[in-house]
Each structure stands twice: as structure tokens, then as C-alpha cells.
Amino acid sequence: YYVYGQGGLNGIYTDPAKAVLRADTLGGVVLNRTQQYVWERGNKKTKMQIDTEGIPEIVLQGTYDIKTLKKSLKKTGTVIDLSGCSLDSVLYEISAQRPVIAKTGADTSVVIVGYDEYNTWLYDPVKKETYPYGMNDSTDLFQKAGNVFITYIETVNY
């Protein structure tokens, strides 16, 4: 993962979360090896809602087991572990139409499928329902669970 900021290449990382954290301090961007934007500082829409019908079933199950996700999504895209990043940072992924699996407890998770000024929109893998949850409450919920966030970036075929 390539971090660009302050006019040039700043660093190369194997850990996407570390790349995002670095780019955030620089007001920069993170690109992958195929030059796709993985993350951009300050370039997210004010609100976004992703239709759950277009999300792969393995993501909707809310598993945060990286091996299982990689195996199931290998033809679809690359799994990106953003654990340790802030909720505000990972909302860029939603803005880019990428759902984010977020750990909420020891064995529980949700899929973040949207946000607006006041709420995140969370998909519950057990109830199979989407509901709004306050932004501050979401931040607290995810922080208490360790800020474990997993998303994926679709493969581009040139």
C-alpha cells in the first residue's frame, strides 16, 4: 500500500491500516499496487447508503475471519483489514461503495452499509435487518470492541 502526501510518495506499507493511519496524519491518500484508491483524507460524501442486494453473502454474514473472507472473495476482490483505524476513517470505504464489517463484541458484528450526518446504517447479520445507529454511539460501540474493521476492494480487470 502506497501512501502519498505532502507532494509525493511518503511510504510503502504491507499493512493497510498502518497506511491509512499514516496518510491520515499527512492529509494524504493510500493506493494499492494497481493504483486504486484504498483511502483518501477528506474526500468522502456527506451521506451514503449501499444496497445490501449487491453485497456478497460472505460479507453480509458479518464474519471477521480474514482467512474465510479471503477464500470466499478471492475472485471478487482483495480483503482489507483496517483494524485500529477510526470509524471516521473507515466511513471513506462506505463512501466508495464498499461495505465494512465491524466487530461489536466477543462474537458479534455488524456490516456498516451507510451513514449520514447523525447515524451509521448497520446491517445485522442475525436479524438480516438494516437500522440507523447514532454516530457517537457507533464510535463508542466499535472502540469498545477494539475498532476491528474489515472491508474489500473489488478487483479491476484491465
Each model region followed by its residue ranges:
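Predominantly a core beta-strand signature of beta-propeller blades
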Residues: 9-10, 130
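Conserved active-site-adjacent core of cysteine acyl-enzyme catalytic domains
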Residues: 44-158
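A structural signal for the beta-strand cores of small, secreted beta-rich domains
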Residues: 14, 38-40, 110
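Residue-level detector of conserved, well-ordered beta-strand and adjacent loop positions
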Residues: 4, 14, 31, 113, ...
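Short aromatic-glycine-(Arg/Gly/Cys) micro-motifs in beta-strand/loop hairpins
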Residues: 1-8, 28-29, 37-46
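A short, charged, amphipathic alpha-helix used as a generic interaction element across diverse proteins
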Residues: 13-31
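Short, flexible active-site loop motifs that bind/organize anionic cofactors or intermediates
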Residues: 8-9, 80
